């Protein structure tokens, strides 16, 4: 086994004494930093490489801190208006995962970069920490490399905001088979429109 395989096995045993101590120290350190900050190199290099990261020019890694728990509705003094059924403020569940939220925050903060992927690094009772791999689409090293040219196209702008990353796709209910009948045709909206549109074929 190579070195990355050993590192992968270490990260799988998160309850080991060494990793528990390491994560406790790291979460304390991460809490002192800003919510979105750049890191010089990936904390988990074997995981980052599996997700597409390479130690080349044009690749950057940012660490994002996301608060755990429910999503609170951003209203002034709890004034939601409307019917009592929609008066909820505190117990609302976010449709996106915390990882997808972290990717979105990094993508908004760094608008000129493209989000490639992300992975979990640590968590405590209050926060979850993710590292997001981003690519500079205007760097010559990226534009000249056949493996990374695809992300420089305009269609991939803010792909993290449209549920096109790995974490974003998981909340869209996509897949094949009878379990995913609600999203046949690409999305829930596309599926609903197809089932609720009457088509009258012209008689010839």
UniProtKB/Swiss-Prot annotation:
Classification lineage: Eukaryota, Metazoa, Ecdysozoa, Nematoda, Chromadorea
Record-level Gene Ontology MF annotations: RNA binding; structural constituent of ribosome
Coiled coil: none
Annotated keywords: Ribonucleoprotein, Ribosomal protein
Family: Belongs to the eukaryotic ribosomal protein eL15 family.
Cellular component terms per the entry's GO annotation: cytosolic large ribosomal subunit
GO terms for biological process, alphabetical: cytoplasmic translation
UniProt cross-references to InterPro entries, sorted A to Z: Rbsml_eL15_core_dom_sf, Ribosomal_eL15, Ribosomal_eL15_CS, Ribosomal_uL23/eL15/eS24_sf
Record's protein name: Large ribosomal subunit protein eL15
Pfam families given in the database record: Ribosomal_L15e
Region (Disordered): 155-204
